[in-house]
């Protein structure tokens, strides 16, 4: 049997529960009370098609044998941390969570996150190494799902800086590597898309700054400490109202569209599944009312951006964009018809 010591989460059994109870959950509860005005986990609801108690029972049943929670990605740490906290609190589900090795800048950080049920997504190397790492990760995730474990993974590599959350087909290809039938592999993963909604993004001004830096220099690379600053800002920054909305397993959609999906090529199936994940995440958005106070908030965020050659018009446009795109995607999802 192949081992996964280079990427696997540490298996610490009951000790994980003790650590959660004594350290992790009190800290997350502190952040919930101090850094959000409200937080809730919903099964369907909101402005989605899944409104009834029967819909909620269906989603709870989807979670019973473990699921792959594929989400939009806004915050490096808190996206997964609060999802894990909420699932554990409400349904006693503790998902394994993916974390990029680029974030493991120190040995103690790697030890800690693996201890907290994080597995490592290795992103280093040339094309051959990338392919080998993807195969290794895919086999590990499929092994966990074969044992009924739940998984968290973002729908794309890196955060969507502009708020335009779109599933990367490469993520789906990685998850189904080594499988003869793509749709069968997706079914075994039991993907339940989750929409993560923050009223305010503490890292919005840092993201806008990064977008100008990349615009001005396409070869720009993050300096040492940039990710650590984003992690700290995301953890301790105010997020306002927070909503995590779990949508049904893709298996229901696949059952309803079985004949049409089976006529497609594998690449067409990948694209169709990616679009359905996008739809379920977009339709699950919580759309927040924005008034004059929000414009003042954006002005304050603009002032916080420190950089040479500061293009205030561009930066303000990017700040608006990252809050506007979810609303536009939600509206488009409501108008969607067919595959």
Task: Put a short name on every predicted segment.
Residues 96-131:
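Conserved nucleotide-cofactor-binding alpha/beta core module
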């Amino acid at each position: 049997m192949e081992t996964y010591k280079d990427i696997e989460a540490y298996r610490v059994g009951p000790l994980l529960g003790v650590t959660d109870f004594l350290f992790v959950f009190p800290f997350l509860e502190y952040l919930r009370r101090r850094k959000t005005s409200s937080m809730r986990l919903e099964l369907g609801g909101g402005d989605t098609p899944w409104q009834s108690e029967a819909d909620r029972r269906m989603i709870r049943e989807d979670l019973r044998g473990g699921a792959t929670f594929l989400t939009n990605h806004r915050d490096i740490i808190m996206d997964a941390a609060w999802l894990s906290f909420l699932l554990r609190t409400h349904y006693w589900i503790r998902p394994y969570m993916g974390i990029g090795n680029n974030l493991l800048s120190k040995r103690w950080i790697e030890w800690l996150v693996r201890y907290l049920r994080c597995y490592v997504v290795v992103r280093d190397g040339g094309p051959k190494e990338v392919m080998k790492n993807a195969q290794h990760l895919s086999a590990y995730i499929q092994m966990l799902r074969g044992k009924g474990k739940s998984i968290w993974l973002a729908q794309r590599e890196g955060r969507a800086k502009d708020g335009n959350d779109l599933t990367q087909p490469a993520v789906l290809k990685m998850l189904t590597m080594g499988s003869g039938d793509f749709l069968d592999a997706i079914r075994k993963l039991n993907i339940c898309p989750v929409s993560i909604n923050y009223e305010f993004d503490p890292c919005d001004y840092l993201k806008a700054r990064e977008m100008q830096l990349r615009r001005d220099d396409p070869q720009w690379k993050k300096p040492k400490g940039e990710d650590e600053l984003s992690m700290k800002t995301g953890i301790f920054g105010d997020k306002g109202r927070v909503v995590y909305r779990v949508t049904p397993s893709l298996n229901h959609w696949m059952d309803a569209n079985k004949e049409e999906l089976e006529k497609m090529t594998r690449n067409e199936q990948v694209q169709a599944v990616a679009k359905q994940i996008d739809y379920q995440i977009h339709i699950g958005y919580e759309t927040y009312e924005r008034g004059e106070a929000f414009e003042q908030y954006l002005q304050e965020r603009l002032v916080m951006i420190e950089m040479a050659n500061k293009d205030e018009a561009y930066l303000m446009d990017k700040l608006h964009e990252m809050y506007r795109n979810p609303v536009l995607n939600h509206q488009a999802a409501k108008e969607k018809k067919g595959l």
